[in-house]
Amino acid sequence: MNKKLEGKIAVVTGGARGIGGQIAMAFAAQGADVVIADLLDSDAAAPVLSSIADSGRRSLLVKTDVSNEEQVRSMIDAAYAEFGQIDILVNDAGTFSQSPFAELEVSEWDRVVSVNLRGVFLCCRFVLPGMLERKSGKIINVASQLGQIGGIEMVHYSASKAGVIGFTKALAREVSNQGIRVNAIAPGPILTDMMAQETEEWAARKLAELPMGRFGEPHEVAPTAVFLASDDSSYYVGQTLCPNGGDVML
């Protein structure tokens, strides 16, 4: 079988579990070696690392806070030292909380925006020079449908993800004529650790609204990332693809 990412090197932030973990495993299944940048340790990342090995690919786990400039720089340096190049960057690392706006602390605003948006900036900032030099690369930023429609008591999270979508469009306009494609994914309600923070009442109400009548699974987002990382998406630039079960129809 012809693998879509054969011989490629991918960096996946937040790749130790959840959506990022599924993306990392799907990339390996399609022939890529994967650098996982995450705050979780090797024990927590073991299922993903084992799956990558089972696909016959190499992996590197680098403990990284994506909001920290020096840690991101060190992670990218480690990726180049191990693999020599970076073909694909997936910015999936993120954080989440809920708060009525009138009670939202400045420190919590800063924390969420720093991880979700500053982290995307930093990873792109340190990966992009190598891609520009080679005139080749794919950048995939994981946003959220709440960046498109907003979420109640989630102004900070929604703003950070809307920023990711805007960042994606602006960077795509700047670098697409240099062989680098930048796109985003805005998942809908996916069964991740973040969604586990929601109440049973919210879940029941949301399920009743969904055209498909069920929440999505992390593995259902991964094929979108494979598509955007491969040559199958050769004419996609600055787009936001939405695996959301029909929850939002644009």
Show the residue positions of the predicted features.
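Active-site helix of classical SDR
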Residues: 124, 160, 168
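Canonical Rossmann dinucleotide-binding motif of NAD(H)/NADP(H)-dependent dehydrogenases/reductases
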Residues: 5-35
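Alpha-helical segment proximal to the catalytic Tyr-Lys
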Residues: 129, 173-177, 234
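Substrate-binding pocket helix/loop in short-chain dehydrogenase/reductase
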Residues: 100-101, 108-113, 195, 202, ...
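Catalytic Tyr-X3-Lys loop
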Residues: 95, 102-121, 136, 140, ...
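Residue(s) in the substrate-gating loop at a strand-loop-helix junction
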Residues: 144
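Short C-terminal tail/terminal secondary-structure segment
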Residues: 149-152, 226, 237-250
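A conserved structural motif in NAD(P)-dependent oxidoreductases
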Residues: 210-221, 232
